[in-house]
Amino acid sequence: KGGKFTITLDQRLATDNHIVIYEDSIAKDGKRKLAARDLEFMDNISVNWIPANIDTEAEGSHNGENYIAYTFYIENKGEETVNYWYTILIDDVIKNVDEAARVMIYFNGQKTIYAKQNAYTNEPENETIPFYSEKEAVLEQRKDFAPGNIDKFTIVIWLEGDDPDCTDNILGGEIKMHMEIREEYKESNE
C-alpha cells in the first residue's frame, strides 16, 4: 500500500512568533497544515531511482510512481530570532514496513537520509542516520532562525529495495507519517 504525509505548524509558534509554512515560494500563502498527495500503492525502489534534482524540480507535492516527495518553506515573518524543532512521527505501521522505509530530507539543500536500524545487526543502514526512536523517524532542532529567514524542506519517503529487511513479508504493508514543526520538543508518551 501507499502512504500519507502531512506537515503541521504549532499554533503558538505561528501566532506568537509569526512563523509561517507554505508550498508556493511566489504566493507565500501561509497555512498551519500542508498535505502531500497520497500514494495508493508504493513498490520498493532504490534511492538511485529518485531524480537527482528532486530538491529543485517542483514545489508542493511532486510524487513519483513509488515515492512521496513534498517541498515546502518555513519563514520567520516575526521580529525575533527563534529556535524550532522539526520531527517526523510514525503514526501507523502495518506488516513491519518501517523496516525498509527511508525518509530523505533536504534542508536548505543539504541531504540527509534516515532509516530504521537493521533488524539483524542493530547497526545503521548504509549511508543513513538511524530513526530517532520507535515512533519518531526524525527529530532535529533549527537554531537561530532570524527574522526574514526562509528554510526550504524537501521530504522524500520510499521503501528501499536494497534494504536487507525489505522482504516479501512486508508486501501489503502500510506506513503513515506526519511532520510537526514546533517551538519546543515534547516527548511523545505513546
Task: Pin down the residues of each PLM region.
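A surface/secretory-pathway sequence property marking extracellular, secreted
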Residues: 5-37, 94-135
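Detector for methionine-enriched segments
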Residues: 42, 104, 177-179
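Short, polar/proline-rich extracytoplasmic segments that appear immediately after membrane translocation
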Residues: 1-51, 61, 175, 184-190
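Alpha-helical structural elements
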Residues: 36, 44, 65-67, 126-127, ...
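Short acidic, flexible loop segments centered on an aromatic residue
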Residues: 83-97
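C-terminal, structured domain-capping segment
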Residues: 53-82, 89, 133-190
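Short edge beta-strand segments in beta-sheet-rich domains
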Residues: 2, 98-100, 172-176
